[in-house]
Amino acid sequence: MDIDQYMTDLGRRARQASRAMARASTAAKNAALAAVAQGIERDAALLKEANARDVARAREKGHDAAFIDRLTLSDKALKTMVEGLRQVAALADPIGEISNLKYRPSGIQVGQMRVPLGVIGIIYESRPNVTIDAAALCLKSGNATILRGGSEALECNAALAKLIGEGLEKAGLPQEAVQVVATSDRAAVGKLITMTEYVDVIVPRGGKSLIERLMNEARVPMIKHLDGICHVYVDDRADLAKALTVCDNAKTHRYGTCNTMETLLVARGIAAEVLPPLGKLYRDKQVELRVDAAARAVLADAGVGPLVDATEEDWRTEYLAPVLAIKVVENLDAAIDHINTYSSQHTDAIVTEDHDRAMRFLREVDSASVMVNASTRFADGFEFGLGAEIGISNDKLHARGPVGLEGLTSLKYVVLGHGEGRQ
């Protein structure tokens, strides 16, 4: 296969399809989404069989537990896919919406219209759910997309792509609006991220090595996040029950996700109260604890162990595993300073009953999602009511946080006049 020519052909077809998608009716887009949802429900067993073969091959290659977790298509994951499709269909269509329309002294009216970005390239590794999430959001927002999933999910992604194509065809939309790259050759990625004439934006979803490669090589703009180094700070005015619930869920709900807590910060004034029960909870769930000296003293005194001494590198590490760094800090000032020094600007949370401290945390922590008395695991498009997300961005330009429909659009100026000329 000539990868260069193959990718160029995909890009050309996507660009052509993007023009049809930009003018597609809301009814047609929703019909396509409904058809894909019905197809997933109908073919759930076939999808799970294809996924099981992908998972078996991944295990044979020696991939770790976090990787297998992301790759596995469970009944719950299939249900979430279907719910996401229907939730996206139920969302208001932003395309064509005109806002901020104002009269100018010259007599013209100036406003802004929401329009699709055009062609979006999605590069991801071992998450078959991304195939559906990305297709749904790109479709509803009037974009065409080129999906390049990881080679480990090739069989499942091919089955999902077939369902998406059928859904588009039933709705009278071009099947080329959603194209899946049918090769695992890494050269396809290299070509996709440089096709500025056909691709308007790249959204990478994968490990750090993938993101770093794309940051170095891409010529097409990206919506991305590099790491998910998420923190929970337990303030000395926290409710103990809330702290236990939030800290347990933020770490142990799922280990292999970018919104999982990796560092726990505890105010010195509440450390003796909150660390022992948390330490025992984590020990019972076999979470390795990497602790500073102050946390070690409290936990050891409570009989919690084994404990590993934390290093500077631990504050900068996204484990994606049952490992947690714990640090005792003096107060809110120290917590905010630590977070803004080591955070990846993804998601950070505070547990406190003090309203002023909570508001200060929200204002001063420089992350895409900042939470009060809630688990970092809520940093998710589905949980935020976006229907699904195409990814999470910790950049500060264009889109930030979970990226849903509006993140895949832009605003253009529109001017309405009555024959006016500029004086």
UniProtKB/Swiss-Prot annotation:
Reactions it catalyzes: L-glutamate 5-semialdehyde + phosphate + NADP(+) = L-glutamyl 5-phosphate + NADPH + H(+)
Pfam families reported in the protein's UniProt record: Aldedh
InterPro entries in alphabetical order: Ald_DH/histidinol_DH (IPR016161), Ald_DH_C (IPR016163), Ald_DH_N (IPR016162), Aldehyde_DH_dom (IPR015590), G-glutamylP_reductase_CS (IPR020593), Glu-5-SA_DH (IPR012134), GPR_dom (IPR000965)
Keywords for this protein: Amino-acid biosynthesis, Cytoplasm, NADP, Oxidoreductase, Proline biosynthesis
GO biological process: L-proline biosynthetic process
Enzyme Commission number, as recorded: 1.2.1.41
Alphabetized GO MF terms: glutamate-5-semialdehyde dehydrogenase activity; NADP binding
Pathway participation: Amino-acid biosynthesis; L-proline biosynthesis; L-glutamate 5-semialdehyde from L-glutamate: step 2/2
GO CC, one annotated term: cytoplasm
Enzyme class: oxidoreductase
Location in or out of the cell: Cytoplasm
Primary location recorded for the protein, binned into one broad class: cytoplasm
Record's function text: Catalyzes the NADPH-dependent reduction of L-glutamate 5-phosphate into L-glutamate 5-semialdehyde and phosphate. The product spontaneously undergoes cyclization to form 1-pyrroline-5-carboxylate.
Database matches in NCBIfam families: PRK00197.1 (NF001221), proA (TIGR00407)
Homology family: Belongs to the gamma-glutamyl phosphate reductase family.
Name of this protein: Gamma-glutamyl phosphate reductase
Organism per entry: Paraburkholderia phytofirmans (strain DSM 17436 / LMG 22146 / PsJN)
Gene it is expressed from: proA
